[in-house]
């Protein structure tokens, strides 16, 4: 399974609704982009890790990485996770 989430202002909010659609027992990749407050990057990583694990992600590899500045206080990030949902 491969899921692209291109809703930069709402990616994180919609992620929980999208995870139940992922196929089980097979490797999957989720990639998305988000605009967040600069200081929230560690919290976003923790929130997504917990969300993915709660939905049964095993062998989880998550990257939340700043791509560029969006404004004085916000950044544009790339989110990528690979996992197998069980």
Outline where the language-model segments fall.
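SAM-dependent transferase fold signal centered on methyltransferase-like domains
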Residues: 1-86
